[in-house]
């Protein structure tokens, strides 16, 4: 933190995601692990506008494949729309448990409609379908929504392909706060600075980011409205202002302030008013996160002698220790479904992602890297995004909560860190 505060350069603000001239550090994705029992599915080629159809079907296939839960069955040269009769036995014989067919129709005003239908070839029934109005710039978004539909119908869980992620890229002396689709594509810069940017976190509605910027030569917490590019200061007290975390209703932020001495946890309204102290300890309390129901705040504290995860009521009160295995457990992140808690645990000198089942209190290390930090759950609680280091360079890794599915996201030049997975598509 002291090293970061010594950096003294000028900041450049990108007040809208569409601002031209800023380099976009596109993420590339590598699948390094898949689920044990993948669902075989075929996505047939969509007839209609050929260019648009290729974009949509390629996006759907890529989404399903990188999820680690699906095995793509070759469709050969098959191309038919959502209304064509389906020979379920034929596709079942080819090894496909499910099949999706659709079409892309272009209207005179330039807009397009992506239609599709999903079939269960084992039962010989339709699982429903949908139609999405789109245009040339939103074809991949339509593909993500189709993939979400397929994912939910075949797994029973909501898909997260239409969600977005935020992260910070450090390249050529610049810190770029960027937002991208969940697959790393369509990256756009929200803020560019020669000063560090850390701890981005999404508001529950996906419309705002809170983060810490060092542009004032000290850590200050901002809330940034993405649609307009406007932002305001939430916490700029004496000392350090850090680690913002949204309440589930989006009205408050838990923050860490050192204005009264040691770093302690406070809550503050999203407009910066209504400051209230939450923790009272002689140690350092930091990294707060609200539980899914908003009633509890999980945080890191060294009050017991070593960094461990604790929990306290959202309005304060007595804190209870949560982690007991090992001498170093930090960065707690409760799952959106309220069933588990992700955190970083040091095991034999390795900093790894661990997941605790909150009912049984059983802990499982789910990553195989050595320098993990900053975990962030997907909104369906299935995947966890972390920052880690490979070959001396910062990359992002997405790991399933059971450790079986792994993806790696990196940029061609530069370090990428501080990931935050956004909420469901609004």
UniProtKB/Swiss-Prot annotation:
InterPro entries tied to this protein: 6-blade_b-propeller_TolB-like, PD40, Tol-Pal_TolB, TolB_N
Signal peptide boundaries: 1-25
Keywords: Cell cycle, Cell division, Periplasm, Signal
Gene Ontology cellular component annotations, sorted alphabetically: periplasmic space
Parts of the chain that traverse the membrane: none
UniProt-listed GO biological process terms: cell division; protein import
Family note: Belongs to the TolB family.
Assembly description: The Tol-Pal system is composed of five core proteins: the inner membrane proteins TolA, TolQ and TolR, the periplasmic protein TolB and the outer membrane protein Pal. They form a network linking the inner and outer membranes and the peptidoglycan layer.
Function: Part of the Tol-Pal system, which plays a role in outer membrane invagination during cell division and is important for maintaining outer membrane integrity.
Record-given protein name: Tol-Pal system protein TolB
Taxon lineage: Bacteria, Pseudomonadati, Pseudomonadota, Betaproteobacteria, Rhodocyclales
